[in-house]
């Protein structure tokens, strides 16, 4: 079995945010308990390596019963959604489980093209996150506030635009807010801007 997930920030050789790893534990445990042999696939910056983080990931997940594919973004075919790359990637697996809502909008080989070669399934976290979004979208606009932050305005702006008529107010923070502040003439000093 093959699972797509993002391992998040690390500093000084240590994982600094373990929430995302813990969040996929339910799916991993479910698959392992049913006899699956799991390979986790993820990215960690464009050039980072998982090798120094493997022990920490195993400790967080409470198991060593998986293999960890090296940083998928190191491979040339990944970000261009190369079908030949996806076909090669898929050869060793029987199914594909996506538990990575945060990157599911990307047109990458390990998210899109691979589903042409393996039966795709949603992991428990992905199902939960889609359900949460569905619930928010079904709520009345009145009293609804969207809070959005982080970096990569190119991925956040379509979300903001989509929610303009679905939320009463939108609060923007992080590097996304810095873009709006800078355009408005505010001196953001050395703050991150995307």
Segments and roles (model prediction):
Residues 1-194:
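Active-site loop-to-helix "anion-binding N-cap" substructures in soluble metabolic enzymes
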């Amino acid at each position: 079995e093959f699972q797509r997930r993002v391992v998040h920030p690390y500093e000084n050789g240590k994982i600094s945010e373990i929430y995302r790893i813990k969040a996929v534990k339910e799916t991993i445990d479910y698959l392992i308990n049913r006899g699956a042999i799991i390979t986790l696939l993820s990215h960690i910056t464009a050039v980072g390596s998982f090798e120094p983080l493997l022990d920490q990931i195993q400790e967080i997940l409470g198991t060593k019963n998986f293999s960890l594919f090296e940083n998928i973004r190191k491979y040339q075919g990944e970000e261009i959604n190369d079908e030949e790359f996806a076909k090669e990637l898929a050869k060793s697996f029987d199914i594909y489980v996506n538990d990575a809502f945060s990157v599911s909008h990307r047109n990458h080989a390990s998210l899109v093209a691979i589903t042409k070669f393996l039966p795709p399934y949603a992991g428990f976290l992905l199902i939960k996150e889609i359900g949460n979004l569905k619930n928010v979208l079904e709520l009345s606009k009145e009293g609804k506030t969207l809070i959005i932050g982080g970096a990569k305005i190119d991925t956040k702006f379509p979300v903001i635009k989509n929610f303009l008529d679905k939320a009463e107010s939108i609060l923007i923070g992080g590097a996304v807010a810095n873009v709006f502040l800078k355009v408005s003439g505010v001196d953001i000093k050395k703050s991150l801007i995307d």
